[in-house]
Amino acid sequence: MPMQGAQKRLLGSLNSTPTATPNLGLAANHTGAPCLEVSIPDGLFLSLGLVSLVENVLVVAAIAKNRNLHSPMYCFICCLALSDLLVSSSNMLETAVILLLEAGALATRASVVQQLQNTIDVLTCSSMLCSLCFLGAIAVDRHVSIFYALRYHSIMTLARARRAIAAIWVASVLSSTLFIAYCDHAXVLLCLVVFFLAMLVLMAVLYVHMLARACQHAQGITRLHQRQPPAHQGFGFRGAATLTILLGIFFLCWGPFFLHLTLVVLCPQHLTCSCIFKNFKVFLTLIICSTIIDPLIYAFRSQELRRTLKELLLCSW
């Protein structure tokens, strides 16, 4: 029936497995074990998506307007904003369609709903993969700018950045299409989990390496000017705190989603895992929160971008 197809959450194959879903309620009744399920109101979900949408549209518009921001680093930031924009808009679209179908305001055939769901699935999955890839690309770009400062402009040329961006988008779309087509295979889910862990390790290694170099540089300046050691220690603490926040937000926002995928493979019928599966929308909400935080970390800290954004907003008035 159309409503049955419409009520499936986007990436429904990740939310639960065909064998485990029908028995969740019965298993809980037999054991009497309470199952914690956090309910995310659709209004809150849509509001967070709208905030993310506005933020990332502003980032893309500001970078597109200012030619001084057409550098490899800002190209990666722009693509991160674009992929985050697609993550939030695709989830908003899915939620809006489900609400309209449930309210009877949108009537359509089951085949049309299924095609729409498959399209949104591919869009959501590819945009998530792109977001992870561009977070890694930004880390690589910053690492090159610090450790190869004199050769940075010859290494990170605009042409190479564009080729890397094109490769990321094409690879993400193709891999997400394969993922949706073979989402019932455990190997596909494990590949996604391994990819997330690889991005996490890559970012951690690069940023820790950059922090170590920054601390060495600060220590050298301290010795040169014969200042007290606590100044260097304070810089190290601030850098460590910044690094902890950056990686912590990444892990907290994306980790639960990929933990969910891991549990789908390892324990699809276990009662505890089934309880976790019920909180799938919470994990999507955390990813939406990540798309809200990304512009604050990577884009709005730039004085040039903030100035361009201010000009855009003033011109619009």
Swiss-Prot record:
Function of the protein: Receptor for MSH (alpha, beta and gamma) and ACTH. The activity of this receptor is mediated by G proteins which activate adenylate cyclase. Mediates melanogenesis, the production of eumelanin (black/brown) and phaeomelanin (red/yellow), via regulation of cAMP signaling in melanocytes.
Transmembrane segments: 38-63, 73-93, 119-140, 164-183, 192-211, 241-266, 280-300
Residues bearing attached sugar chains per UniProt: 29
Residues annotated as signal peptide: none
Residue ranges annotated as Cytoplasmic topological domain: 64-72, 141-163, 212-240, 301-317
Annotated GO CC locations: plasma membrane
Entry keyword set: Cell membrane, G-protein coupled receptor, Glycoprotein, Lipoprotein, Membrane, Palmitate, Receptor, Transducer, Transmembrane, Transmembrane helix
Stretches of the chain found on the membrane's Extracellular side: 1-37, 94-118, 184-191, 267-279
Membrane topology recorded in Swiss-Prot or TrEMBL: Multi-pass membrane protein
Provenance organism: Ateles paniscus (Black spider monkey)
Entry's family note: Belongs to the G-protein coupled receptor 1 family.
Domain of life: Eukaryota
Principal localisation: membrane
Compartment list: Cell membrane
Subunit and interaction comment: Interacts with MGRN1, but does not undergo MGRN1-mediated ubiquitination; this interaction competes with GNAS-binding and thus inhibits agonist-induced cAMP production. Interacts with OPN3; the interaction results in a decrease in MC1R-mediated cAMP signaling and ultimately a decrease in melanin production in melanocytes.
One Gene Ontology MF term: melanocyte-stimulating hormone receptor activity
InterPro entries assigned to the protein according to its UniProt record, in alphabetical order: GPCR_Rhodpsn, GPCR_Rhodpsn_7TM, Melcrt_ACTH_rcpt, MSH_rcpt
Entries under Pfam families matching the protein: 7tm_1
Protein known as: Melanocyte-stimulating hormone receptor
GO biological-process terms attached to the record: adenylate cyclase-activating G protein-coupled receptor signaling pathway
Lipid moiety-binding region (S-palmitoyl cysteine): 315
